[in-house]
Amino acid sequence: MYLEFYGLNEFPFNITPDPRFLYYSPRHREAMDLLLYGIANRKGFIELTGEVGCGKTTTLRSVLSRLPHDVETALVLNPSMDGDQLLRSILKDFGLTIRGNDRLDYVEQLNEFLLMQAERGRNVVIVIDEAQDLGAEVMEQVRLLSNLETDEYKLMQIVLAGQPELRERLAQHDLRQLRQRILIRCHLSPLLEEEVIEYITHRLQVAGAGEGVWFEPEAIKKVYEYSNGIPRLINAVCDLAMLAGYAAQSLNIEESQVDRALQQLECKV
């Protein structure tokens, strides 16, 4: 609705995990570097945590888009499954036609695939998002997958991504063997107030906004107070604030437009 008025090519504050819109705060850049390092150097298990809405999925998609062409990837987005379903999901994401009907068949097929990739000099990555919701039996299956290795290196790298509860899960005594295998850990924290300014500006620029479209300092301050620096909440209020700005025919988003957005979100700061 407001795209033409602001001269935008697309909506700047959608909540879909589009890597093009990823703003690299120091924590996001560090997480990206650690993830890419762990994958390239075949470190086995890698852990990525962050609060809801802090950009974990977007960061993961950005990492996957930056991997070389000789890296095979599988992305598991639904953790609510048992061990057999997890294995089938992984095999399907690798583009394999599933053979057999039980776990031993699935593991054998996955191992054959991994060995074939190793012979070709190709790396393999499995990303499991929302991993804090994995059941105990599935967690154990994930650990067992890491046993698929050669004498020299891990046949696949497994990224476990989730909310801070994932760290609590992995701290449990019965998951100590899995926890001990995680060699790289990174955490995404909310943005600082000065980073919120850069975040909003970055997303506007990616969407095609010119210099005449911007958020007033008091408007940004109120966005930060509402969102506490969580990108998903920033997007929600900024999208509605721009709609309010369009209704007022104002290129600059003022505090009053953010107030209108917060009213629509039924929130009070």
Put a short name on every predicted segment:
Residues 62-66, 166-181, 190:
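Short regulatory helix/loop adjacent to the ATP-binding pocket of P-loop NTPases
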Residues 92-95, 164-165, 173, 191-210:
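Conserved AAA+ ATPase "sensor/coupling" helix adjacent to the nucleotide-binding pocket
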Residues 82-86, 97-141, 150-154, 191-196, ...:
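Mid-core helix/loop region of P-loop NTP-binding domains shared across ATPases and GTPases
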Residues 76-80, 169-172, 183-196:
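Conserved AAA+ ATPase "SRH/arginine-finger" region at the nucleotide-binding site
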Residues 1-42:
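A short, basic N-terminal segment
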Residues 11-13, 70-72, 81-100:
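Conserved NTP-binding/hydrolysis module of P-loop NTPases
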Residues 41-62, 79:
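Walker A/P-loop nucleotide-binding motif
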Residues 205-269:
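C-terminal alpha-helical "lid" subdomain
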